[in-house]
């Protein structure tokens, strides 16, 4: 098995954004403020999250970025002398650099947020036209990660055409077979989106970051627009491939946190299933958005939280925790700390995520926002085997079966039809399993297996 896995290790794409010290080669692991706090942030919120990442053992598992999302600056203006953005003194009385320093003292890294427009999504000053100044500022503050959004775009920087993103957070739909029949002003078939105003806006910030004497991981957030999957890896180390994971903000549960909904997890997974095979590689990772694990009493079930994390990890999307860690429930923390999925996600040898190999509920390659591909597999030398994820996308308890002869990584090896299998959730050795493994799953739950050597 190990020899076979070594043979299929791939070489990175020639035009990928390769950064010093391996920054961005693997998908990011960390915590981000937006899903849990939105604009209700300050130094205490950020430093509490950083301390919890250490205290809860998440740092030891590779979670390293503590990201300050939107709303960190003064909203009305830049510094009239330097043109720099000004940290909100009420929220960050000692400035962003002080927060960054304290995070670095914990052995962690710090991220900041801006937008490739005139204002951020919450209406704060953004970086279009100020790329050099802002990149210099972020480097001076010793920032390690930049999330760069796509709000506040002036008319003279808007794209001449509209790109189809078959996502209800972006467009009304419906999306038959993943198409957008009602799309206004579609681009000609030969249009090169890498030369679009969108690509140029994001490229300008990359150029500014590259002039700094500091490596800053660059995360693009344009929600799949402008065919970003075709050029994102040239400009950033990750790029959002869909609309926001929770676009309908405002609904809260009894614990006063936003309620995450399974429908968005399924919809984004469905979109990602048609992208990962072509676009996800070392140095460039499609981003399914920040995690919702642990968000909202009365929202997703524990089973749905498990499936959400399993799918994001298997797809090797960046894993940015988006919940309040000082009040997280143990069952949710256990999901975020799953060693099997984190090992696969951070495998330094294999240059690809898990791919869907069977849709299950639907015929293969069916575009269905409610019932995405249910069977995924990917090789992992770090796990000494193949990761297999089985999803029950139905609304009721149902059985799923992994048939070894259908798993691509287990084919053509002349190894017979029996393999050593481990339960990826519990770590339990399931023994030598012949031909297939069958499991009953709750609604929207996922089984995780590591299929090892022939036996």
UniProtKB/Swiss-Prot annotation:
Keyword Glycoprotein set for record: yes
Q: Keyword Secreted, does the record have it? A: yes
Give the positions the UniProt entry annotates as the active site.
149 (nucleophile), 244 (proton donor)
Q: Which UniProt keywords apply?
A: Disulfide bond, Glycoprotein, Glycosidase, Hydrolase, Secreted, Signal
Tell me where in or outside the cell this protein is found: Secreted
Q: What is its EC number?
A: 3.2.1.22
Q: List the disulfide bonds.
A: 39-71, 121-151
What Gene Ontology cellular component terms go with this record? extracellular region
The record describes the protein's role as: Hydrolyzes a variety of simple alpha-D-galactoside as well as more complex molecules such as oligosaccharides and polysaccharides.
The identity of this protein, by name, is: Probable alpha-galactosidase B
- What is the scientific name of the source organism? Emericella nidulans (strain FGSC A4 / ATCC 38163 / CBS 112.46 / NRRL 194 / M139) (Aspergillus nidulans)
**Recorded name of the encoding gene:** aglB
């Amino acid at each position: 098995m190990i020899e076979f896995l070594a043979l299929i290790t791939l070489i990175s794409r020639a035009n990928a954004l390769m950064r010093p010290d391996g920054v961005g080669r693997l998908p990011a692991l960390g915590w981000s403020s937006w899903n849990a706090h939105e604009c209700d942030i300050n130094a205490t919120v950020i430093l509490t999250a950083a301390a919890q990442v250490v205290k809860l053992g998440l740092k030891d598992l590779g979670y390293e970025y503590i990201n300050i999302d939107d709303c960190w600056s003064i909203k009305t203006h830049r510094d009239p002398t330097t043109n720099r953005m000004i940290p909100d003194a009420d929220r960050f009385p000692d400035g962003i650099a002080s927060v960054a320093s304290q995070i670095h003292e914990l052995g962690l890294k710090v991220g900041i947020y801006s937008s490739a427009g005139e204002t951020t999504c919450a209406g704060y000053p953004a970086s279009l036209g100020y790329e050099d100044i802002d990149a210099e500022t972020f480097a001076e503050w010793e920032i390690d990660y930049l999330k760069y959004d796509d709000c506040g775009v002036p008319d003279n920087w808007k794209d001449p055409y509209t790109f189809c993103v078959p996502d209800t957070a972006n467009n009304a739909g419906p999306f038959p077979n993943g198409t957008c029949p009602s799309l206004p002003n579609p681009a000609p078939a030969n249009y090169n989106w890498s030369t679009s105003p969108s690509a140029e806006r994001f490229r300008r910030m990359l150029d500014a970051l590259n002039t700094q004497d500091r490596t800053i991981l660059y995360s693009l957030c344009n929600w799949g627009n402008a065919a970003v999957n075709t050029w994102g890896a040239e400009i950033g180390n990750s790029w959002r491939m869909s609309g926001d994971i929770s676009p309908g903000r405002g609904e809260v549960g009894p614990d006063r946190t936003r309620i995450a909904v399974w429908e968005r997890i399924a919809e984004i997974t469905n979109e990602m299933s048609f992208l990962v095979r072509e676009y996800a590689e070392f140095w460039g990772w499609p981003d399914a958005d920040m995690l919702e694990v642990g968000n909202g009493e009365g929202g997703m079930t524990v089973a749905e939280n498990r499936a959400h994390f399993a799918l994001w990890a298997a797809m090797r999307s960046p894993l940015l925790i988006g919940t309040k860690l000082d009040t997280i429930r143990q069952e949710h923390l256990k999901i975020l700390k799953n060693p099997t999925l984190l090992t696969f996600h951070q495998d330094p040898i294999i240059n690809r995520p898990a791919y869907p190999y069977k849709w299950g509920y639907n015929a293969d390659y069916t575009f269905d926002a409610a019932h995405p591909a249910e069977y995924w597999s990917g090789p992992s030398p770090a796990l000494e085997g193949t990761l297999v994820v089985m999803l029950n996308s139905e609304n009721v308890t149902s059985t799923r079966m992994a048939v070894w002869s259908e798993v691509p990584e287990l084919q053509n090896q002349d190894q017979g039809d029996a393999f050593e299998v481990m339960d990826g959730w519990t770590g339990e050795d399931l023994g030598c399993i012949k031909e297939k493994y069958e499991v009953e799953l709750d609604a929207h739950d996922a089984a995780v297996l590591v299929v090892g050597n022939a036996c």
